[in-house]
Amino acid sequence: FTYLKKWYPGANVQILSASKEKFRNLGIKEPIIDIKHKKYKDDHECTKFKYLKLSNNKKFDFYLIIPVISDPFEINDFKKMVPHATEWNTYTMSEYNDTDTSPVDFPIGVGKNHLGLFFDKSILEKQNIIKNPYAVVYIQSSGDGLLHSRYCFLSFVEMVISKTKYKSFKTFEVVIPYWIVEDINEYYPFKKKCLEIFKKYYNEIHLVTKDESIELYNSKRINCKRIDSKRINSKRINSNKTSKKQSNKTSKKQNNKTHKKIILRGDILPQSREKFIGFIQGSIKDILLTGDESLVDTLNCCKGKTIWYHIAPWKKNLAENLYSETGNKNYKTYKTSCGNMKGYKFKNDIDKLIKENDFRIKGKARFDSALICFHENNNNKESV
């Protein structure tokens, strides 16, 4: 939408959508024509066009369908909603590196035969909520069809907290999606594994929800209980002096060791796009993401970040092409794409990725061609 407004300033560009709020959250304030179901009021994002209707029957010269949900795209289905649609004025666009709906007119994504990513100047709002160093995790849950979501999160945090450059942080925070909060609270094996990893480096572990702050672990409290237990036992065997010596030694060891805390922040997300980009910018160099928008937003604002990527089954092709373009071997498999303990040094040519996969260059050329074809056909009565 933003590209078309910039490229063709004289054109009237409008959005037709079944999810108006998503565009509002992206900061788009222009009028949006609602797409509604002919019978139902519930979610209908992935419904065939023949079951849908427009809230406004305004006619347009040119239609771009993004993303395509049927394979292949059926112009006759679209005509049920837009009767004057033709093969000359209707074009299709895929999601990034989508292989399920090809062929399309605008195959966006990374690599050969794709038109690039939607790069643009970032608009962000600097975050002022978190004062300590922090990491950002923004991935989908297992409930969304991703079987290795928990594994992905654990791989990332274990890698990050073990890095020497982050070990000096006395308090470290991790911004997490709310499904991780729910899994920690409701699925004990996951909670147990989280605690096992964090206890290696931190004396305190806190989980912040939208309603409360929960202390999951505190080594000071445990040591106090142990010392008290030793004192009770020593009285029973009349060896109180020995007990005091042991407790003093334990206390000295704890005092000499830096007390470190990790806070899992489940109270931050979701945010508007501008605020979310602000959180990305202020975070440590390593970041864990999934999906399209967050990936491109991070490349736009902060190309110096090391992006660890949660590979969804339907994004495998994107990950493979990210590997081809950047040389980052971690993108080859989900086992290393979220975090890799075996080695931190690897090729990651982000400059090449951005330079050779810019939709503003590749996409503009194809849009110009499409509009020329439309114009020629519209003004040539002999065209079929």
Where are the predicted features?
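Active-site and donor-binding regions of nucleotide-sugar-utilizing enzymes
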Residues: 1-107, 179-184
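C-terminal alpha-helical cap of glycosyltransferases
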Residues: 361-384
